[in-house]
């Protein structure tokens, strides 16, 4: 795509120098996003390619293909009512069966597609995991199918961070009987394993951890985790509803840009009874009862065995060592 035509350039130059220089920079940024995510004609409502097939905007919010099969994937049984008990059981079931993982982006370099059909095929049919935009995206589709009043929100990860962090995460807000709850099944860090009441200023217990919400000066919410008598910040977000299309640009950057942490390190995590299992690059870490056991996975066979045994991931593509 050309930077701009003569008519557009003339319009820029008629403005003060600083303004049109900034406008050109913004124009370049927009063009870069458009080129990187292979936008098609806006008049056709198409966005990205799945092979040779264009994916339409509407497919990002398409209904869940098969609720029963999704529930079987996460081992969920029992009544399905849009209440808090069901929500918490769904969150826990998902966290213990569907791993956070970036194998497609790190090991394969494959595009991460966010339409419902692609997410369902990857997570449910293939038995894979994914990262935040995939996991929370499909989970929101499940909740909507069940009848929950819910919507996604954009999130900044501020855990172990300094300075102003960009939007790189998503989560969901669910309203039950007039009360808003925050839920997240796609954070690779120390996330709550149940829904948290958004407007409760006190500490809330979730599994072995305690969390608390606070409001930042800009009006955003910040989630803190209580650690050793103190607090560490985890996530910062605005409760404004988003659309799934809003996650296309950050998803493209995080999954494809060489500067993204997801392109520089293998990250896998799953909750276990009383702990968790994680792989960072080629190191397996098992957290159990406050103890951590580390194992170096220095061969591809060891890595594949760990992926299958601890995360339920059976993959056939080559893995980096």
Regions found by a protein language model. Give the residues of each.
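Short beta-strand scaffold segments in enzyme catalytic cores
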Residues: 170-172
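Mixed-charge, low-complexity segments
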Residues: 56-129, 144-166, 187-321
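Acidic/polar hotspots within intrinsically disordered regions
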Residues: 5-6, 27, 52
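Active-site beta-strand termini and strand-to-loop segments that position acidic
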Residues: 174-176
